[in-house]
Structure formats: C-alpha cells, structure tokens
Amino acid sequence: MTRTAVLLLTLLFLVAMAASDKIKTRELCWTEEECENWE
C-alpha cells in the first residue's frame, strides 16, 4: 500500500470514530460548539 492510501484510510477511520463519539455524547453537549470541542 502507498502512503497516500494509508493516510486516506486513517482519515476515514478518524472521521468514523468522531461520528460515533458525537452520537454517544450528543446528550452531554449543551451547544454545537461544545460538541466540536469533544474531539
């Protein structure tokens, strides 16, 4: 695998993790800005 492919897969993985974290912690967020600070 090329380094570019590895970077793309890593980015996709991080985005997926961030999305699942948002779903899990959505009720803990008061505002959209605080939600983004969870990352």
Swiss-Prot record:
> What's in the GO CC field?
extracellular region
Q: Which GO terms describe its molecular function?
A: toxin activity
Q: In which tissues is it expressed?
A: Expressed by the venom duct.
**Annotated compartments:** Secreted
* Signal peptide stretch: 1-20
Q: Does the keyword Ligase belong to this entry? A: no
Q: Which domain of life is it from?
A: Eukaryota
Cysteine pairs bridged by disulfides in the record:
C29-C35
Which keywords are on file for this protein? Answer: Disulfide bond, Neurotoxin, Secreted, Signal, Toxin
Give the domain note.
Answer: The cysteine framework is C-C.
Its biological purpose is as follows: Probable neurotoxin.
Q: What is this protein called?
A: Contryphan-Cal2
| Organism the protein comes from | Californiconus californicus
Q: What is the lineage of its organism?
A: Eukaryota, Metazoa, Spiralia, Lophotrochozoa, Mollusca
